[in-house]
């Protein structure tokens, strides 16, 4: 959070962030939207975990890429859950909205669990209702 932003970031909020340059990364640095995925309990830490968004929809769709069509985004964007990263809160520039749709939030959780090889369990930010969601069957 910069000096003009006093608000603590919450899970599933969409922020504009200044992403740092990362050597050997396919992710573009600079100002771009991200989805905060850190839990509320970590509010006092100097960093948050984020998933970067891209407007490039022409790349091959992966199970860890979630399409978000959200009124807070000027174009449909893909959440790159395979590029989850820690980010210093000072790099968060401005809150632009949040992931409103429960299905999109579920899809983000599922993609993160898939990428991190975690079971989709209540301890991973899922509610009991999510456990019985039709997408979780099988």
Predicted regions span which residues?
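Short alpha-helix capping/helix-loop boundary micro-motifs
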Residues: 1-4
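Compact nucleic-acid interaction/catalytic patches
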Residues: 25-70
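C-terminal terminal-subdomain/extension
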Residues: 7, 70-138
């Amino acid at each position: 959070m910069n000096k003009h932003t006093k608000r603590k970031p919450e899970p599933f909020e969409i922020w504009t962030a200044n992403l740092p340059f990362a050597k050997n990364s396919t992710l573009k640095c600079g100002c771009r939207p991200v989805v905060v995925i850190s839990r509320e309990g970590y509010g006092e830490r100097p960093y948050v975990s984020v998933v970067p968004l891209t407007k490039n929809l022409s790349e091959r769709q992966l199970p860890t890429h979630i399409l978000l069509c959200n009124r807070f985004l000027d174009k449909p964007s893909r959440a790159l859950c395979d590029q989850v990263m820690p980010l210093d809160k000072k790099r968060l520039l401005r809150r632009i909205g949040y992931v409103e749709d429960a299905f999109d939030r579920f899809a983000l959780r599922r993609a993160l669990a898939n990428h991190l090889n975690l079971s989709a369990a209540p301890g991973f930010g899922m509610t009991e209702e999510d456990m019985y969601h039709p997408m979780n069957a099988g």
